[in-house]
Amino acid sequence: FRDPKNALMPNWLEIPIGYNGRASSVVVSGTPVRRPNGQIKLPNQERPVFSPCLKLDFELETGFFVGVPNDLADPVPCPEAESRIFGMVLLNDWSARDLQAWEYVPLGPFNAKSFATTISPWVVTLDALEPFRTQQPRQDPEPLPYLRHEGPHAFDIHLEVSLRPQGGQPATLARTNFKYMYWTMAQQLAHHTVSGCNTRAGDLMGSGTISGPEPGSYGSLLELTLNGKQPVDI
């Protein structure tokens, strides 16, 4: 799969590369989050250093819980996927961007996202969200047949991110909406299971960062600051 000239990435000899998706550090809102330690690669230095994270970030997401499992080798058809979703939560996919920048090639984040994921304490059922159902964005090119479903499958959910500095007042950093998501929850579940992967009741799936089309609607500091190039007023 890889170019023989670059068979090993520079981080291969420094980190036991892996990809991490885990439930052990999913915590409820209000649980303290400790700044993670890890390897970071500073500019103009040949080797990484072990350090506390210097670029701790949030990711504004939602998540959904599987309510009705599917068996191994029995994929969930996209048109019936919503019937297997119990409900939604708010989700903050905490991210250590400097750890992530060093470790993510070639498999993706590992320690950069494993230290905490915060979810809201209440699950909102899809029945309760029915009045907010709306049409999802147009998908071009048309998805492959296993990812197709008829009708509206997005939800008009207004979302905000506020940051309160110690001793200060909350400042709103972003305003966005769940309806901007390109892929629906039904498509996400259908794709997750299409290979035959089984799910269990209680499995949690995150939406990915929810960002809108305009500045001020981006769901992470990475995007809001253009990776540190643009200040954000707090």
Question: Which sequence ranges carry the predicted segments?
Answer:
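Active-site pocket scaffolds in enzymes
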Residues: W183-H191, N198-A201, M205-I234
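Secondary-structure transition/capping motifs at alpha-helix termini
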Residues: G168-Q169, S195-T199
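Active-/binding-site microenvironments in catalytic and ligand-binding cores
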Residues: A81-E82, G167, L173-R175, G208, ...
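Active-site microenvironments in enzyme catalytic cores
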Residues: F1-A174, W183-A186
